[in-house]
């Protein structure tokens, strides 16, 4: 049976999609913690609120990135694990994608995906982080791996492509219809602009 997750499309954290979390725990960017739904359950929720978008779980899993939430990086734990580490990653000290660390790659670029981050020799990483000019911090490789979780960048996924062949039909948001005014004198419908002019039919004034 295909599993689905529900995105709250009203907003992202950085460029990470937000999903309904398991056990009613609000929202999460962590794909592991996203509530699983059957196709029928996902469609039913989308019909109730069109901003809740169903995604096939398998589609997202194939495109997920592994990222580290800065909120779970404890300085004491970093210092302790650096003592025995052989490899470490460097990340920008004052830049985040939502809450996620921005790592350095081997060619001097930046990435949010831990799999693309350069695993520097720990002595080199520590020396670079110690120089304030570099504006980078260090995290041991094994600690980063333990903290990493799968997230979905909105630029890597396409909703129409994901739903192709699933049979899912999205609810259509209700069309907005502007309220129509009537002439205070003869009752004929008038446009918003005509509320401040004489009625085109009876010539009565509708000015406030």
Task: Show where each model-derived region lies.
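Short aromatic-glycine-(Arg/Gly/Cys) micro-motifs in beta-strand/loop hairpins
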Residues: 3-29, 87-113
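Short Cys/His-rich metal-coordination motifs, predominantly Zn2+-binding knuckles/fingers
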Residues: 183-189, 202-205
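A short, charged, amphipathic alpha-helix used as a generic interaction element across diverse proteins
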Residues: 26-53, 106-142
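Residues immediately within or flanking Cys/His clusters that coordinate Zn2+
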Residues: 176-183, 195-196
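SH3-family beta-barrel domains
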Residues: 1-8, 158-162
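Short, mixed-charge low-complexity intrinsically disordered segments
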Residues: 45-74, 126-175
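Disulfide-bonded cysteine-rich modules in secreted/extracellular proteins
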Residues: 85-92, 180-186
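Cysteine-rich micro-motifs
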Residues: 193-207
């Amino acid at each position: 049976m295909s599993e689905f997750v529900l995105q709250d499309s009203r907003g992202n954290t950085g460029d990470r999609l937000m999903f309904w979390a398991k056990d009613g725990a609000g929202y999460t960017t962590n794909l592991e913690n996203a509530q699983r739904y059957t196709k029928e359950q996902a469609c039913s929720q989308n019909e109730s609120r069109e901003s809740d978008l169903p995604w096939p779980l398998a589609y997202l899993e194939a495109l997920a990135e592994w990222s580290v939430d800065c909120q779970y990086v404890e300085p004491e734990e970093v210092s302790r694990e650096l003592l025995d580490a052989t490899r470490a990653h460097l990340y920008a000290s004052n830049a985040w994608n939502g809450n996620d660390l921005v790592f350095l790659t081997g060619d001097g670029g930046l990435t949010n995906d831990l799999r693309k981050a350069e695993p520097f020799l720990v002595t080199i990483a520590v020396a670079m982080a110690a120089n304030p000019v570099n504006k980078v911090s260090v995290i041991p490789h094994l600690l980063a791996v333990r903290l990493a979780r799968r997230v979905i960048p909105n630029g890597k996924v396409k909703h129409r492509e994901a739903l192709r062949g699933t049979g899912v039909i999205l609810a259509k948001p209700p069309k907005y219809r502007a309220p129509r005014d009537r002439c205070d004198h003869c009752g004929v419908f008038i446009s918003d602009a005509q509320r401040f002019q004489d009625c085109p039919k009876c010539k009565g004034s509708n000015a406030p």
